């Protein structure tokens, strides 16, 4: 059977969602000079850059952006295909900072748990918050986003695919049934 593709967010809707998420981060974060955005490879990194760019556009504050690879922090290394780790890039020490971890989709919560472990190796943040473009539910761990672009209840066998211009040459979110 051919998979059915359903558009969830168009390019324009992603742009508006990023603007809204940036506004929420500004509103709920207080001191933007104490803020660091850290994107999870792969699509969390360009999302973090887009959020930071929007914050700068709205508030005139350049928020540092880092990128973190969680490959060696995963708890399912025995079940995933061999993957070459990406390079973690941290803008500065996270100690005492508010870190906003950015990812494209949250599902079971295991990627986020791995990212928490990775971040702690770079210092002790004052707090870690989570921003996701899509929350599809089905958590196995007690992890919930502080900032959510779109809540999308899904069946376990369905997939959510995020496309970003910087990686995929287009912007959009699709549900694959």
Curated annotation (Swiss-Prot):
Q: Which residues cross the membrane?
A: none
Keywords attached to this Swiss-Prot or TrEMBL record, sorted alphabetically, are: Glycosyltransferase, Transcription, Transcription regulation, Transferase
* Primary enzyme class: transferase
Gene3D superfamilies linked to this entry: 3.40.50.2020
Per UniProt, the short sequence motif PRPP-binding occupies residue numbers 99-111
User: GO BP, one example?
Assistant: regulation of DNA-templated transcription
Q: Which InterPro entries match?
A: PRibTrfase_dom, PRTase-like, PyrR, PyrR_bifunctional
Q: Does the keyword Membrane apply?
A: no
Q: What's a Pfam family this protein contains?
A: Pribosyltran
Which reaction is the catalytic activity of this chain?
UMP + diphosphate = 5-phospho-alpha-D-ribose 1-diphosphate + uracil
EC number(s) reported in the record: 2.4.2.9
Which Cys pairs are S-S linked?
none
Q: Which GO terms describe its molecular function?
A: uracil phosphoribosyltransferase activity
Q: Which domain of life is it from?
A: Bacteria
Cited function: Regulates the transcription of the pyrimidine nucleotide (pyr) operon in response to exogenous pyrimidines. Also displays a weak uracil phosphoribosyltransferase activity which is not physiologically significant.
Name the family.
Belongs to the purine/pyrimidine phosphoribosyltransferase family. PyrR subfamily.
- What's the protein called, per UniProt? Bifunctional protein PyrR
Q: Which organism is it from?
A: Microcystis aeruginosa (strain NIES-843 / IAM M-2473)
**Which gene underlies this protein?**
pyrR
